[in-house]
Amino acid sequence: MADIPDFVKNSVSWNPWHGCHRVSEGCRNCYMFLGDESRGVGDSDTVRRSKTQFDLPLKKDRKGSFQLKDRLVLTSMTSDFFIEEADEWRDEAWSIIRRRKDCTFVILTKRPHRIGACLPPDWGDGYPNVRLSVSVENQSAWDERIPLLCDVPALKHDVFMAPMIGPISTDALLDRYKVDCIYLGGEYCPNARPCDYEWVLGVRESCIRHGVTFHWRNCGTNFIKGGTVYTDLPIETQGSICCSADIDHIVDDVMPKSRQTTLF
């Protein structure tokens, strides 16, 4: 069985605002919308500042220490950090990120075209505690979003290839742009679109050729391997399949060991 990657231990999600709008095929079965629906929340497309979460990284315990310890912080996982409705709150969020230099903030977006206009004045070549990331689900999303992400200066550029709903040829853009890590996962939900193992291997081989770290985190609810379709796989089984395959490719430590995490 593969060793658990450095990023698969413990993390925290920070959702300073909640709510989003679907922008592409990868959003069809978004867990945020499905989760809100299961709780009877009917206005998931209304973006609201969180009353309880906004200042989470700055909250302190009775001893005056930060409640949120040095770790990886998955940012805006129930929205998009660069969504238009959050423009009036984002400067304050950047200030919080700036103050917590001991944490690493993973900022994942499907709106890379907005990143440049939403960066703080002192961004420079990037904050040392921020990893800018995009999610891509198919070839068109990859072709559109990777140049937009990598044209923005940052110390780390990552890609969450999830949910992977079709084959993606990555060589051409990896020849041109520096990507640090690709995390790949299938779609896990009722009526999930299948992920094919051949697609996974194709991305992995491209990562090896280009010196990019590759992590396969789940195979999806419906998974195809060798022409056989496996359906309705529970999330625990999906993770076991990935571990048994042992195909992660680690170029170097993606995260400090003190910031090991499970990425949603």
For the regions a language model picked out, list residue spans one by one:
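C-terminal accessory extensions appended to soluble enzyme cores
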Residues: T221-N222, G227-F264
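N-terminal [4Fe-4S]-dependent radical SAM core
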Residues: M1-L72
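Alpha-helix initiation/capping motif
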Residues: N15, R48-K51, K59, S169, ...
